[in-house]
Amino acid sequence: MYVPEEIIETIKMIEYQNLDIRTTTLGVNLKDCADKDLDLLKENIYNKITSYGGNLVETANKVSQKYGIPIVNKRISVTPIGLIMGSTLKGLSDEEAIDACVEVGITLDNIAKEVGVDFIGGYSALVQKRATPEEKMLIRSIPKLMTKTDRVCASVNVATTKAGINMYAVKKMGEIVKETSEITKDAIGCAKIVVFCNAPEDNPFMAGAFHGPGEGDAVINAGVSGPGVVRAVVEQLKGKDIGTVSDEIKKTAFKITRMGELVGKEVASELGVDFGIVDLSLAPTPAIGDSIANILEAVGLERCGTHGTTAALAMLNDAVKKGGAMASSNVGGLSGAFIPVSEDAGMIEAVEVGALRLEKLEAMTCVCSVGLDMIAVPGKTPASTLSAIIADEMAIGMINKKTTAVRIIPVPGKDVGDSVEYGGLLGTAPIMPVSEFSSEEFIERGGRIPAPIQSLTN
């Protein structure tokens, strides 16, 4: 039974505090689409995705209208393409194999445009231990794919807690990001490439979403967005102790999650597919007031990035998880607080005034999801340094048994003090400094960093 106060509170959240459903993401299994013939493979993929997702946008809009809750993005994720390309690429030269992978990516892009979704994820490879020949070709094809498509997102899982870190893949991904930055306008292609440790199979958020091998045939996963709501609550708690702040954030996260599950289940029911999970992540936008950094500042920090930031973020992240887990039994995905620099107005300001640096962001990723996200660095940054930044972040995820990721953008012709404007949800990225000292010899070693011991945890 809802009371009038709750209804008014929800209206305030939506109208004044930027509360919305960030995404309803349809995951589709493509394992049964594999075929030796490339044209048949593409046809199978088209038929499978459109049969489930043809009405996704229309259905989400209908549910949004029914409940008066904005659903900002409608997206699709698919089985990692690296898992279904083996028979298609057999016997092809490297160049032919790369072109075949890109053709599949173009098919995904065309499907996304036809059904009207914002992004389609799953141009992915899972190579935490070793890469198969087809996965190597898929990874090599990513830069070319980014020049040919608009809505396809790529991700590569290079590490897990159980497998360790594949340093060959880490090295390669630094090179892939660097190459992509040089051949796409303002390095925009890099905004659609994520490198993961412990990638979740049910993540609804881009650019790292894919439909994991352990998922069913089709499923709806929902992601909520409520930094503005949490900030409004925290601002009413001046002088209260941190335990009280945590409790109030928990209660707020409960309400946000309950709304996300309601909408996600309704969309799934209308489409005739299973409901998967609601992702508890607080996802910021460039809109003023819809910022994770501003929440931390409302807790009592002069600027996000100063001493105490990691502790405040740990409290926030844990409170959101506790409140969300109470609201739903179907929790998954990344489920934490996102700290993407270019997508968070408060983070952008913190970087611009010198309060927030790459090293502090790395420390913050130890206590939240999902990692170094939408970080713009000077275009002159060498591939080995990009690989080393990736390796550091993968190590944090591997040791701490959590998902970490890197989405980094070396912007050609830009240096510290400059910024690059992407618009929309991707926002504005100030160029952040990286170390001028080389990591090249370390990266050139290759090999695999072994999985960590599980009993001695200090």
UniProtKB/Swiss-Prot annotation:
One Pfam family here: DUF711
Gene3D superfamilies named in the record: 3.20.70.20
Source organism superkingdom: Archaea
InterPro entries with a match to the protein in the record: UPF0210
NCBIfam families tied to this protein: PRK05313.1
Family: Belongs to the UPF0210 family.
Protein name: UPF0210 protein MmarC6_1246
Organism: Methanococcus maripaludis (strain C6 / ATCC BAA-1332)
